[in-house]
């Protein structure tokens, strides 16, 4: 989010030269720079011991392609706690091991997505109301079910070691 008004006092921001940052919004009333902000989210490639990845269908995200488990961090929650919670909420699975992979800026929605590999024991899914369907997909078939170049596609490609 780029600030036009101060979120603390409501004053209109002015552009001010701030060191190496250059021109940026500044609140003269509060005497503070107004740094751009983003929503921090997680995205998980959920994998099992059979070399399969859990892919989800969520109509509100894509009518034609699959996605990965993803969600917004809650205040006071670590990224790892968010990832474990989202896997449990969306798929009803318990994470055995969590590995951080990398971060992915998603400028279109002003988000920073933190990518994880979540290792689970293969089991039937207990889907949340926001998931239309999910399936275990062999590593060799996973990328073709995701939108090429999407953050989910990039994460799964890294996790399964595809080139």
What do these predicted ranges mean?
Residues 1-61, 72-124, 163:
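N-terminal leader/linker segments that precede catalytic domains of diphosphate-processing enzymes
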